[in-house]
UniProtKB/Swiss-Prot annotation:
Pfam families: Aldedh. The lineage of its organism: Bacteria, Pseudomonadati, Pseudomonadota, Gammaproteobacteria, Enterobacterales. NCBIfam families: PRK00197.1, proA. This is Gamma-glutamyl phosphate reductase. Keywords: Amino-acid biosynthesis, Cytoplasm, NADP, Oxidoreductase, Proline biosynthesis. It catalyses: L-glutamate 5-semialdehyde + phosphate + NADP(+) = L-glutamyl 5-phosphate + NADPH + H(+). GO terms for molecular function: glutamate-5-semialdehyde dehydrogenase activity; NADP binding. GO terms for cellular component: cytoplasm. GO terms for biological process: L-proline biosynthetic process. Belongs to the gamma-glutamyl phosphate reductase family.
Amino acid sequence: MLEQMGIAAKQASYKLAQLSSREKNRVLEKIADELEAQSEIILNANAQDVADARANGLSEAMLDRLALTPARLKGIADDVRQVCNLADPVGQVIDGGVLDSGLRLERRRVPLGVIGVIYEARPNVTVDVASLCLKTGNAVILRGGKETCRTNAATVAVIQDALKSCDLPAGAVQAIDNPDRALVSEMLRMDKYIDMLIPRGGAGLHKLCREQSTIPVITGGIGVCHIYVDESAEIAEALKVIVNAKTQRPSTCNTVETLLVNKNIADSFLPALSKQMAESGVTLHADAAALAQLQAGPAKVVAVKAEEYDDEFLSLDLNVKIVSDLDDAIAHIREHGTQHSDAILTRDMRNAQRFVNEVDSSAVYVNASTRFTDGGQFGLGAEVAVSTQKLHARGPMGLEALTTYKWIGIGDYTIRA
């Protein structure tokens, strides 16, 4: 089965690479329109997936990731339209010039070819990834989690119908609908057809891909994100940022999981934090230095376990640790962070600059929420993933991250001397 999908995707990629921006936007507009026109079919399929997942004991955080609503589906369609409005990087001349030999040389952006994406209970990923791949002239093979099987099948059927209505091959966007985990291992060895692989899931999936894949892998998306509250932070303003970073949508990878509090501000900050977290329904996992003071407040508090500093809660849970100073905070982030998104709240711009320079994450913020790490927020459109590695792409992966380049030399029967 996968062999045939690979052949179809590779053939489709040749066709997609030749499309103009106008032609690619036409199919994207058609996909957006059809997602809305066929919304009832997609939502019914999703309702069945959610019901099955709930019956199987899926966590509330994962159920939130899985669930579609009419508003969320409309937002997904609108994201596709936003991709239409983005500049097409394909064909862009990055640099170039004329050599002494007279050869005119340029470096031009081109599609990667075929992208493989493995992800879990996130039905929006299906459309986000497909739209970005199509905009950049890439074919894509999707392998979603078993929890989204019906939703993905319905969504991909809509996308393929839109492709065919625009005289493009359905093989441009395909999904593996068999939940057999053995197919993941098989997919990881499809280097004959797939040019880049992007896993979007837990640490286990990333480890499997790094160890078994014969395809170049872009890893990321695991977000053990931190906020450091410096001693000069404005408490009321800091709390607004923390509430946003923790509660706006707890199941996302850019949600803060650990709060590091400078010891010199702890006595005034912790009572205010407890009050705010109680109102927000957040459970605090406190270290020994913060535990007694937080237990005196209204928030629900438990003693933090050492391993929780490495956990991506994806829920209304927040670690709280007292640190001696900025150096202590940076050391903690280096040990427990995932190089995703980390922030400092401070009025001391020297400390802010040190934090920016010394915290080696794909996105670092000063006096802002970690929730901004998102393709849409960065003006990149829907993202294919958030890369936490350093080669090829880093941070939210928009259109340019789905391209490579080729060198093109144009001469007049020019020969090398």
